[in-house]
Amino acid sequence: MNNLLDILNKSVNYLEKKGIKNARLTAESIISEVMGMERIMLYAEFERMLSEDDLKKIREKLNDITNNDKKISDNNNFE
């Protein structure tokens, strides 16, 4: 599923695996910026589906933060 809550949780897990401190805050900030909404609204609209364009932007920002050679691809679902 590509709803807000699912992508938020996958993003947090990804950042934690990469050793990023404050992984939840970082993921919330990235997703809220991409979606153009306040962080609190991520939870109020947790069932909202994300477009492929939104997912691509989130992946790019996560990759920028982790600055890792192994990038998140469209196929590996943030894991």
Placement of each model-derived feature along the sequence:
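Non-catalytic accessory regions of SAM-dependent methyltransferases
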Residues: 1-50
